[in-house]
Curated annotation (Swiss-Prot):
PANTHER family: 1,3-BETA-GLUCANOSYLTRANSFERASE GAS1, 1,3-BETA-GLUCANOSYLTRANSFERASE GAS5
GO biological process: fungal-type cell wall (1->3)-beta-D-glucan biosynthetic process; fungal-type cell wall organization
Membrane topology: Lipid-anchor; GPI-anchor
Induction line: Transcript levels are elevated during host infection, and transiently increased after induction of hyphal formation with serum. Expression is controlled by CWT1 and induced by fluconazole.
Biased composition annotated in UniProt, kind: Low complexity: 396-426
Family as reported in the entry's similarity comment: Belongs to the glycosyl hydrolase 72 family.
Phenotype upon gene inactivation: Leads to decreased caspofungin sensitivity.
Location in or out of the cell: Secreted, Cell wall; Membrane
Protein's name according to its UniProt entry: 1,3-beta-glucanosyltransferase PGA4
Broad EC category: transferase
Job of this protein: Splits internally a 1,3-beta-glucan molecule and transfers the newly generated reducing end (the donor) to the non-reducing end of another 1,3-beta-glucan molecule (the acceptor) forming a 1,3-beta linkage, resulting in the elongation of 1,3-beta-glucan chains in the cell wall. Involved in cell wall biosynthesis and morphogenesis. Plays a key role in virulence.
GO CC terms, sorted: cell surface; extracellular region; extracellular vesicle; fungal-type cell wall; hyphal cell wall; plasma membrane; side of membrane; yeast-form cell wall
Keyword annotations from UniProtKB, A to Z: Cell wall, Cell wall biogenesis/degradation, Glycoprotein, GPI-anchor, Lipoprotein, Membrane, Secreted, Signal, Transferase, Virulence
């Protein structure tokens, strides 16, 4: 019995310690243990799409069904657009970690995000509570590669008014991660590849004196390489020029034009070549499952997965295309870029709004944020009671990184004043704690063996 328990515990510990976290240095990603440069080879993953919203990382059966196909493709990263922060994601994240797969997570849901129509009101305490609750849930996993604070919020002139609020969310997320004592997890923005806004957006989110308000990575949703295009007939060459001196990791957060199907994915050879590695760090193919937009690599029907020619072509391209050797000619940069000049196309203030006062208790690590998952309808909660009231004086103790609340099963969205500061449970997830437990079990086993 003791031996069986020991084996079970060793299996748990090995899984916890099975994958190195990814860090940012200069304009590249790096394996924190080996020191090797890390290139994103991945797919965008949201089975059901936005019309049938489900959390694929909370369903163990779905996760186990799909991870074998991730491995067959040879990918190392998935991007997930929405999760339910009331649920537990440990089993799936552990399954992915064992397969060597990282997750880039968008922290927003359809009704909990910065809106283009009223960015000021959607940036409120209840919204930030949802964001912070998602961070608490996923910061515990070493294979959480990073978080996106927004996706394609800026796509035309009127939407520029939302830019300062998205940047404020970046600041709040990074501040929350730091103050809670979590490891440094990259926070970024995923941009629509609209010619006139792609570069200024990238510069804007990576400029200014406050490094907490600057992104750590920038994703571009690009579909300019169609069929058997080239660096010049697509927009790849232009983007290489535009971002030659960009100081944080840049990658394609979506790519894979479907004007011609099956897609040949000939761009893979370019993306993972020395011609692009000085600026780009890989990308994510849109998308894993066939949805209404017809970009899928597989067809899902219940527990059944059927791969298509797109899947086979992508697999073949990944198999024959290796990453550049060494550091790939990365830019050893520090600090941000210059802010984009104002023009008739780009007219955005460099000042960003203050954090709603009701959210300060979370930023200061005094209260545990409570998520409400897909039931969070908070975009109009700027007038909610307590949204802009500093109630930090009501709290006396701080929450550490190794103390976190179990996922809430709350079914109703509470107002800003109805937060659960006392919902913290001491669930230890720090690798050092697991390591200490590991040594204790070894010592116990050794003692038993001597009897």
């Amino acid at each position: 019995m003791l031996f069986r328990s020991l084996v079970t515990y060793l299996s748990l510990v090995s899984s916890v310690l099975s994958i190195a976290s990814i860090k940012v240095e200069g304009n590249a990603f790096w394996d924190s243990e080996s020191g090797d440069r890390f290139y994103i080879r991945g797919v965008d993953y949201q089975p059901g799409g936005s019309s049938e919203l489900e959390d694929p990382l909370a369903d163990t059966n779905v996760c186990e069904r799909d991870v074998k196909y991730f491995q067959e493709l040879g990918i190392n990263t998935i991007r997930v657009y929405s999760i339910d922060n009331t649920k537990n994601h440990t089993e799936c994240m552990d399954t992915l970690a064992k397969a060597g797969i990282y997750v880039i997570l968008d922290v927003n849901t359809p009704h909990s995000s910065i809106t283009r129509s009223d960015a000021a009101c959607s940036y409120n305490t209840d919204y930030l509570q949802e964001v912070f609750a998602s961070i608490v849930e996923f910061a515990q996993f070493d294979n959480t590669l990073g978080f996106f604070a927004g996706n394609e919020v800026i796509n035309d002139g009127p939407s520029l008014e939302a830019a300062p609020y998205v940047k404020a969310v970046v600041r709040d997320m990074k501040t929350f991660i730091k103050n809670r004592g979590f490891r440094t997890i990259p926070v970024g923005y995923s941009a629509a590849s609209v010619d006139e806004y792609r570069l200024p957006s990238g510069l804007y989110f990576n400029c200014g004196d406050d490094d907490m308000a600057r992104i750590d990575m920038y994703g571009i949703n690009d579909y300019s390489w169609c069929g058997d295009a080239s660096m010049t007939t697509s927009q790849y060459s232009q983007q290489m020029k535009d971002f030659a001196n960009y100081t944080v990791p840049l990658f394609f957060s979506e790519f894979g034009c479907n004007a011609k199907r099956p897609r040949p994915f000939s761009e893979i050879e370019a993306i993972y070549s020395t011609e692009m590695s000085s600026v780009f760090s890989g990308g994510l193919v849109y998308e894993y499952s066939e949805e209404a937009s017809n970009y899928g690599l597989v067809e899902l029907k219940g527990d059944s997965v059927t791969t298509n020619d797109d899947f086979d072509n992508l697999k073949s391209q990944f198999e024959k295309t290796k990453n550049p050797s060494g550091d790939g000619g990365y830019l050893k940069s520090t600090g941000g870029n210059k802010c984009p000049p104002k023009s008739n196309i780009w007219n955005v203030t460099e000042e960003i709004p203050d954090t709603p006062k009701g959210a300060l208790k979370y930023l200061k690590g005094l209260a545990e944020p409570t998520g409400h998952g897909f039931d969070a309808y908070v975009q109009g909660n700027c007038n909610a009671k307590g949204n802009n009231v500093d109630d930090t004086g009501n709290y006396t103790s701080s929450i550490t990184a190794s103390s976190r609340a179990s996922p809430s099963q709350t079914s109703q969205v509470s107002s800003s004043s109805a937060t659960s500061a006392n919902s913290t449970s001491s669930k230890k997830n720090d690798a050092a704690v697991e390591g200490a437990g590991f040594l204790s079990v070894i010592a116990l086993a050794a003692g038993i063996a001597l009897l």
